[in-house]
Amino acid sequence: MALILFKWFLISWASVLPLRQVPFDEVGKTAHPFYLAVTEINHNAAAKTLEISCKMFADDLESILEKNYRTTLDITTDKDKSQFDRLIPDYVSKHIALTVDGKPVKYNFIGFEYDKESVYAYFEAEQVAGVSKMDVNNSMLCDFQDEQINILHVTVNGKRKSNRLVCPASLSSFSF
């Protein structure tokens, strides 16, 4: 279901984004005409946690990890899973910072999933009893593409708020 919704979301965005002719990137992978990542942050009041998921195009994530960490990776096989388990949380922690009610929030890596063309990375922040205001600094993949668009969805007490950031913009504030 999530995959269907995400594809619907991508198709709707594709209709408003300027398309450019980019058939292949430098390593021969098929390029896509827009660069998008979606970060969902849900406050779980009962568990006093923030549940964070990041969805990115697999080839974009693979390319930026290869560039930044000077390695060769293949997300389509299990042979590099331990490298991804180490590199994904390191990269994300450098590109997503959370502040809740004026206090920095640290989060832990739960794991990741590869699904055809997407990677889902999961994180959790503990001991977050309530949220009145959340600031999110999200520069995910801005070091990969200048045209990167980061969509943020934050849900607190059943109320969902969203924002779209186009690099270099990276800061978004949510009040509940």
Where does each model-flagged region fall?
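N-terminal soluble domains immediately following signal/targeting peptides that reside
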Residues: 25-176
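Bacterial Sec-dependent N-terminal signal peptides
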Residues: 1-32
